[in-house]
Amino acid sequence: MIYAAFRSIGAYIPPKIMSNADFEKIIDTSDEWITKRTGIKERRIANEGEASSDLGARAGELAIERAAISKEEIDLVICATVTPDFLCMPSTACLIAAKLGLSNVMAFDVSAACTGFVYALNVAKAFIESGMKKNVLIVGAEKYSAILDYTDRTTCFLFGDGAGAAIISATNDKSESIIDINCSSDGNYEDLIKTPGGGSKNPCSQEVLENKMACIKMKGNETFKLAVKTLTSDVKTMLEKHNLTNEDINHFIPHQANYRIIKAVGEALDLSDEKTVVTVDKYGNTSAASIPMAMNYAFEQGKIKAGDTILFDAFGGGLTWGSALFKFAPIKR
């Protein structure tokens, strides 16, 4: 029997910091208001000319290095993003593969907004367990600064740029494998989080540009309530399915959208603050990159170790949501 194992984690954090004080200069807001509402203190911004593939390639490079495998051993690249380098083609995954020097490798994108990394992990798991692939590089990469309206005080301060990546590999040892992944969606809530212009429904036009329809729009209050309810239910279902309790989880890594959401879900699940990884204060909401960036942060802080049981939980536009339960299983060399 072939299983999928989570072998390594890596991230790229752009060096440029945009603080709440910077937003005080461009919109009617304050550091106190942003911090109280979201828990965000600062976020990272990619350099001009940098694209999601540049961020993703840097994160991927680190993940490959930590997995202690050669680039030639990678046979699939999946990139989760909603800020691709190009609107239609080529895929960001293809560009990441090229920048990593990978040739003749299968590569494609996954679009599931903030749940994208969990979706990509699920696809990687399926490819490996089917025997079709042995080593998969999954990347969550976002340059949200490219799709923000910096006059919109309801959204512009929420998001940041960055990338995270992981190597998922085949193993015969069930004890070190990915235990389970759940991915769901409900398109009836499409209006809660969306970029209304630029696609085939509302193609690029003078109207789209003038009304900034190619920028992200979000109904914050409705999204908040639904996120807390959905994330809590999803985790409870996952734990009950495997006869686990919160005591069996070493690290809870939720999507980093808003500290109040993270806190509310943690309290509903009775998960201690010590087990919950929080980076939203440092990076803001980096969508598909937020979970791997948060895991990488905890790993570099020495908190995540081989054999730890980790639980991902994410919620995003679509709507999409999902959870993943797995053992962290770096290759022993």
From Swiss-Prot:
Described function: Catalyzes the condensation reaction of fatty acid synthesis by the addition to an acyl acceptor of two carbons from malonyl-ACP. Catalyzes the first condensation reaction which initiates fatty acid synthesis and may therefore play a role in governing the total rate of fatty acid production. Possesses both acetoacetyl-ACP synthase and acetyl transacylase activities. Its substrate specificity determines the biosynthesis of branched-chain and/or straight-chain of fatty acids.
Subunit structure: Homodimer.
Keywords linked to the UniProt accession: Acyltransferase, Cytoplasm, Fatty acid biosynthesis, Fatty acid metabolism, Lipid biosynthesis, Lipid metabolism, Multifunctional enzyme, Transferase
Name of this chain's protein: Beta-ketoacyl-[acyl-carrier-protein] synthase III
Domain notes: The last Arg residue of the ACP-binding site is essential for the weak association between ACP/AcpP and FabH.
GO molecular function ontology, one term from the record: 3-oxoacyl-[acyl-carrier-protein] synthase activity
UniProt cross-references to Gene3D superfamilies, sorted A to Z: 3.40.47.10
Family membership: Belongs to the thiolase-like superfamily. FabH family.
